[in-house]
Amino acid sequence: MGLSGISPLSLLLILAIIVALFGTSKLKTIGSDLGEAIKNFRKAMNSEETNDTQKDDHKPL
């Protein structure tokens, strides 16, 4: 058994259907866009944490 009761053969069949529907070039574009979105999200989260710690440093005790 694979993930959540899905067999590896079923996963390969689903992957083949997705490739047939979208084509490899479209999947590559989607993958690149998704990776860039995740990278930008992480960058925004890290900069927000940095800004929060800088604001906390200047609070009076």
Swiss-Prot record:
One GO MF term: protein transmembrane transporter activity
Superkingdom, natural source: Bacteria
Keywords: Cell inner membrane, Cell membrane, Membrane, Protein transport, Translocation, Transmembrane, Transmembrane helix, Transport
Pfam family, one: TatA_B_E
Compartment(s) of residence: Cell inner membrane
Principal localisation: membrane
Annotated TM spans: 2-22
Topology within the bilayer: Single-pass membrane protein
A GO cellular component annotation in the UniProt record: TAT protein transport complex
UniProt keyword Kinase present: no
Assembly description: The Tat system comprises two distinct complexes: a TatABC complex, containing multiple copies of TatA, TatB and TatC subunits, and a separate TatA complex, containing only TatA subunits. Substrates initially bind to the TatABC complex, which probably triggers association of the separate TatA complex to form the active translocon.
Entries under NCBIfam families matching the protein: tatAE
Family: Belongs to the TatA/E family.
Protein name per UniProt: Sec-independent protein translocase protein TatA
Provenance organism: Legionella pneumophila (strain Corby)
Classification lineage: Bacteria, Pseudomonadati, Pseudomonadota, Gammaproteobacteria, Legionellales
Primary gene name: tatA
